[in-house]
């Protein structure tokens, strides 16, 4: 039987083809389904599944159960592969060829678009406005209807045609005495001896120099070092309508001589002669006309033609020349240069702490110290600010005599003269001049990103920022948050009839795109926000808004937890957006754990029953109501309320009324807050998206504690001080970043258990006979690793215009080690066999070795018994990586004075995983430690001992503490959205 055509009895054997009610899905037109047969990618167990097309379909299940394997690695990957396969071989050369996922057949697929969290732009030039393409339309709008101004005096400037200028002149009072001038020199130094001869030959007779009119053959002698203004007298006339033709011809000639700029002097003097007279402000009125954009007061400020590229900070025409359009510059941070506790001689100047005591650099600094009255043998903290400034910025051209005990190019005992450049100028020069990437990166350790002092973060040239629409330049528009931008665009912007024809369609597109961003809960984001500062959830929702704006139909969208980082209040907006995408006749496939999203789905698929090797099966599929009634579905039990995360019976009290207090927090949108975090309890910082939670906890608290307690080179956000740090000895940030950056990293190496395993193998009789040490059992260094694949287990074969192919190493057959290392065994297993064990298997295998077993048990306890000891770090989800980190912390001895900081630890976790996570976090706090969690998940919020709720809105309308207290106290507070939603969860 082909294409899954089976009778009903056979269908009932695989619930993936059935709704929980038992009816086969094939009752409808087969074309209405994506039909998957025999999917075996990663841990999928040969599953068969029909997914309805043009519906909102949610895939859920435990972390590691195979949701992403089905949605992304199978369905999306195959949809994308087929689309790429349909292109020419020339196009595929640039796009690459995707591997075919492991399945029998898939029918009914559409071209697929993935909207995940891993594709966030890391380009510092990308902003919210550029990613959503709103900036492209803003550039077009400003280029077509923007009003240019002088960047110095800010007066409006315009350009006119010859006819416009002539008509303006003819409107002056009849009988006016006028002199038409063509500016040929404007505020330039020189004698300009050539002017007299050059223009006499062209038939001109008079010139105005610095306000005084001269005959050209009597051109004055000018001071070479002074700035001068020189205008050629093109014509003189008394205004009369009959002179229209002459005036028009003269103005045209003057515009050509003045390169588009002319001056018209309205003379108030009645005398007939003008030679030698100072025709300045007292007796004349100066009128300036231009064919180009030019300021009459500052004519040297050239304003180019308004084109879209002029408003791009990625193009040299518009980008700030100082920061090249980045808005920021890398600059040496004096705080990172000094180690205040050491003397200069001991290496207190970090960039030069490896120099020898008799080095040229140190001798020169000793000479500076001797002359300016300080010693290189006292701790830097004891030096005055003035002395530190000398060390950092040098002493100018002041020279010092330095005696050298000769070596190399220096003569022994010779005395040399030298200036002292200063630490910061020296590092800046070397950073600019060096061709060595190593040297540049080494210097960048002492640099920090600072706002560009030329454009002040606007990224554009002053002349570009002087172009406005209703008083706002393009940077002002981008500095608005999404909500404020919509308010501005909803106003009745006044344009001329011609401008309105141009602006109306552009504004319509901008308004739509910004509205879509508001609809996905991003109303607090400023359009100028750098894309690389967005969280995964924010970046994903921006891409979602962009896709809605594209208006595509008949597409398969695959999304990965779009509700991440979203407050419950904004969830309804997100669900409406997903439905809107579906209503455009698209299939929307969402991997999600949020209960509201699941209940809003047209179709729900539950993958399980466990994680890893114990998962990969379709447990239940059908409408949310059908899943809720399915006793086999773990998800269904939580949806129906049959299973719940219990509310804690008691709440912990702060440890002896001890608090960690942040005073005067002013970073980003924080409103000069003073916040008290109780010690010895679990505190959740909640609040709507963009309210300032991450700024307070990560940028200020975590960075300051890491710098103070661990000497990390982190710079805390703006605040006055933090009190109570002396009650802590460690600060550990447990986030969802990978546990390693290379495929060689794995749980065994990260947790440190691999060291104990290698040492165990080194004690085996065979290893001792051969003299093997623990290093012999490392796959990262020569000795025991296979040198054919250098310990990778696979060899990479470059396929040029095809993607690289990885082939199992023919020498070690994927075992990573050479034959000699594999001959050493423990309980019949070699080192490669151990790395291929799951955590569950390894716990049993090493049960008699506490140093190994105890660490592995903590990984087992966090629900990761299914992962393998040697599994590559790059294959773990964010939730799995975070739980490995938590397990590592659990295995360490608790001091009771540790602060743990977690940012949305429930990302990627099923409700049952959240239940398990809460029990583990409770164990960490039970040891007397303190935990601060940023979280939207109401199960975590209700389990907290203390809640700090921020708001009331996001962006500039946030940054305040709107409620503090126990979950029960917050739930009674009608002023906080968190409290309103929390009430249901406390019942």
List where the protein language model places each region.
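Conserved phosphate-binding elements of NTP-dependent enzyme cores
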Residues: 1-987
